[in-house]
């Protein structure tokens, strides 16, 4: 039997992929950005109708988005962006490159990537940790930074003894915005996004703390992250996991990538 080593071949600037990257990054062009007070937090982007709102309208027109798909509802606390990409067109590549681009343009260095299933989680992890992928973004795309991926896993069952703050969350939070060559990414599957007694992200009785935080959800909230959601049709706004992201993590921005998006009912119609 022959052993064959195969490397993923990536092509830079495929038109549909570049369009997806620019569509997100351009949303924040010429908007007010406040420098973070704490070393573990993202810069704070001002979400105004005159800034972000006008940019979104211009991007939709530029990309000839159909009027029925151009809804924009202003929310000053959290911006929600939906990026439609057909299956097999490189969503993982696009959202990974988008993180690099947002870091390059605006200094955003804390991202949480939420996926619906373990196979998708494994695929995303393999892609972002791959040496060839890292070299591609550095040497071909010219990004002067590297992703440090922290993957959240369920805790091993312990009958007795001290419980420790989740290591992936701790390392993610401790990542400093002063290190301009690092982009910190926390990868989670939706089953871990729960609020329940003694559950890993919502409990506050750990034997250690991270930057003064006893509760992992509170620590994540303090980083003011951007959240990326893959496969939103499996991760609808009506599900508890999405509510946990909104209420417990309270990100500045939620970016959903998918081929289909679940409909939500409003009054007698659907949105």
Describe each model-derived feature in a short phrase.
Residues 1-51, 55:
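N-terminal accessory segments
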